[in-house]
């Protein structure tokens, strides 16, 4: 094997290893982000029973976005609220309750 080829192969292997670790970290970071948005949105939805959150996988540049679906206490009809998570302040705000006549949303069976 030529002497010049060994450093090139070592550099290629190191680059591939770094890229795979970066991709895994990035995936882990996005999963942690989605978990944080879900937890914060569900905690803020105190007026809803049996609430679940459907999180936009990446949100926007500044905000995480989710739909929170649940039944208002004392009601039998499910509603949806839009939840906005500020990525910098780590705070959430909920929109008003959207009824099924306004928007139709079906939460996936695996929603939290």
Which residues does each PLM region occupy?
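Mitochondrial intermembrane space
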Residues: 5, 20-112
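Classic N-terminal secretory signal peptides
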Residues: 1-23
